[in-house]
Amino acid sequence: METHMAKPKAPAGIENPVQLAVIGAAHGIKGEVRVKTFTEDPMALGSYGPLHMVDGRVLQVAAIRPAKEVVIVRFKGVDGRNAAEALNGEALFVDRSALPEKLEEEEFYYADLIGMAVLDEKGENLGRVVAVHNFGAGDLLEFRENSGPTVIIPFTRDAVPDIDLSNNTIRIDSITAGLDNAELSGEEDEAEGPESARGSRPRGPKSAGEPR
């Protein structure tokens, strides 16, 4: 499973940057790259318009196709494997104005959650969110512990009772989330929590790829 820590330094010239993706390894010899997106619909990445990098460069999607856990993207002007390899690790941003303006209550952009600090009931920092997944049974948050391993918990109201965007923090209920001392000490890498914690909790706009 690929994981990517965020949020890196944002690009200059964007008033309210939102990270949509991070570029991975080159794919083939024609300039394509593997891209991990933080959008609900990975195939919609090209619908947001120009994608900004931290160093000020701007990329536009020329072609996109699905792959396991990522999408394969060819950007305009990126020709050949060497050019593609030079993009490895680059984060891609858009201004928030490019996203649909209104969210429902208890709805969040996946991109907003990446990099948020995960706190337990006592306020202890457990790590930071590195990914949001959905394998068909509901949204899951993956966070990387301060000591190293990653943990997966259900993204439900019971397991994640508080999300504070202004302070960039998420508070979890350790028991409902299915965490125990063994998992937090690194003996287990993943925990999906009890089935009773998989209540409905809307996330991310359904039309995440539609430009304004």
Curated annotation (Swiss-Prot):
MF annotations from Gene Ontology: ribosome binding
Subcellular location(s) of the protein: Cytoplasm
Entry domain remark: The PRC barrel domain binds ribosomal protein uS19.
Recorded name of the encoding gene: rimM
Signal peptide annotation: none
Protein family: Belongs to the RimM family.
Quaternary organization: Binds ribosomal protein uS19.
GO CC term (a single one): cytoplasm
PANTHER family: RIBOSOME MATURATION FACTOR RIMM
Positions of transmembrane segments: none
Stretches for region Disordered: 181-212
Domain of life of the organism encoding this protein: Bacteria
Protein name from the UniProt record: Ribosome maturation factor RimM
Pfam family, one: RimM
InterPro entries: PRC_barrel-like_sf (IPR011033), PRC_RimM (IPR056792), RimM (IPR011961), RimM_N (IPR002676), RimM_N_sf (IPR036976), Transl_B-barrel_sf (IPR009000)
